[in-house]
Amino acid sequence: MPGATFSVSDANFDKEVLKSTEPVLVDFFAEWCGPCKAMAPALEQVAAEMKGKVKVAKLDVDQNPEVTQKYTIQAMPTLMIFKGGKKVAERVGALTQKKQLQDWITGSI
């Protein structure tokens, strides 16, 4: 299911996340982050299965300092859910099980 998530950056964060008509889960990650890599397969599955209910975006913190600083990201992975242009949920740490991710998302949107 690769390709169910999409990348966002400092340049398109407002358009793709804050102005989205559906909720967006943003995975703030780093290429060197082991827990981020461990969570990636579950995130892809959830993105595919929840398509139409929530979009799943990935933001590389090392490549996008503006958004990273704006939301005070200090540990990876950090997951945030945005709805209607506002952050409605945040979780620091990996959720490697698909059901854990789905339950957290469903409870937040």
Q: Where on the chain are the PLM-derived regions?
A:
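N-terminal targeting signals for export/organelle localization
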Residues: 1-5, 109
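A short beta-strand-turn-helix
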Residues: 5-24, 65
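Conserved Rossmann-like nucleotide-binding pocket used by diverse enzymes
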Residues: 9, 29, 55-57
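Short pre-active-site segment immediately N-terminal to redox-active cysteine/selenocysteine motifs
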Residues: 21-22, 29-32, 75
